[in-house]
Amino acid sequence: VIFLIILLMASLSLVGLSIKGATAKASQETFKNITNSFSMQINRRVNQGTPRGAGNIKGEDIKKITENKAIESYVKRINAIGDLTGYELIETPDTKKNLTPDRAKHFGSSLMITGVNDSSKEDKFVSGSYKLVEGEHLTNDDKDKILMHKDLAAKHGWKVGDKVKLDSNVYDADNEKGAKETVEVTIKGLFDGHNKSAVTYSQELYENTAITDIHTAAKLYGYTEDT
């Protein structure tokens, strides 16, 4: 099962699936300048989605949709959690206050991952919340690649071209298969952007989010791009 958002482009058309929180707000900004668009979501009367409330459209179904000749291009998205095992995240005084010993043990190095096949059309980049400041955007041909926040990279001395490892998190509710995967990814680019309001947990900070290719995000949950 793939957890995602699809953007179908016909003169830059967009289809969004399971848009939540800040992503939903960014997506609303995106829609302002997009025409010929329509949206699709799972039917929550018969499909409640993932434990954390995301959609779960299968990759094989996406393929059927995108075979329509009227669709010029598309963007699909997978939300995941990936651990930078052994490395600390960016913290603020507020997030430190909420970092209990139990949370630190289970999620102390957990990045919020968005897997996407075209990062230039990812909501937060389109809305301006994120800005690529070094390197290149992810494309459909990328595999084992990541875009990382420049502040997190600077904290650990990482630069474009360096390799880092992401581990599955067995405590993540959406890791329903209990996957224990490790994916070595190459930093393809660095982005900037900061929250405009206070946050409770470190994973809500833009600095602790990352964009990867679809393959990487899916593998962290024990899936492939098509399942």
Predicted regions and their residues:
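Alpha-helical transmembrane segments of integral membrane proteins
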Residues: 2-12
